Amino acid sequence: MDIKNVHIKNHEQTAHAPSTLEKIRKVKQGGKLSEQTKTFGSTYRRLDPNQPSPTVTRSGYRDFIHPFEDRMLTVRELACLQTFPLDWEFTGTRLDSYSSKRKVTMTQFGQVGNAVPPLLAEAVAKAVSEQLLDVIDEK
């Protein structure tokens, strides 16, 4: 497959406000903005390419800065951290939006953050299946 000619779904970058870019630029690899400003908690955290990723959460678009570029991760990049295959498509809006009844709809970022990583789910299912088969075989 020629990757140059493949459209990767859910890989749209956010157009950051100048004030957000200013915050992002301050954060070094593996660091957090809160280490410099004593605010923002765990948000604005730049990934270290040599370390495991922190847990991806529903609000992940505010948590993870690309390790090499001054921008937040895309839905697709977060999905890759969660082990979703490249052909998996997330639907709905990327960021929070409100319906006419003022209920928050599930966003693409929310779908990724709320998901059990597929490879983790597979490993758990295999382990449970093996244990159940062992119990059945014992009877």
UniProtKB/Swiss-Prot annotation:
Catalytic activity: a 2'-deoxycytidine in DNA + S-adenosyl-L-methionine = a 5-methyl-2'-deoxycytidine in DNA + S-adenosyl-L-homocysteine + H(+)
Entry keyword Metal-binding: no
GO BP field: DNA restriction-modification system; methylation; negative regulation of gene expression via chromosomal CpG island methylation
Signal peptide: none
UniProt cross-references to InterPro entries, sorted A to Z: C5-Methyltransferase, C5_MeTfrase, C5_meth_CS, SAM-dependent_MTases_sf
Quaternary organization: Heterodimer of an alpha and a beta subunit.
Record's comment describing the protein's domains: Corresponds to the C-terminal half of the enzymatic domain.
Protein name: Type II methyltransferase M.AquIB
Taxonomic path: Bacteria, Bacillati, Cyanobacteriota, Cyanophyceae, Oscillatoriophycideae
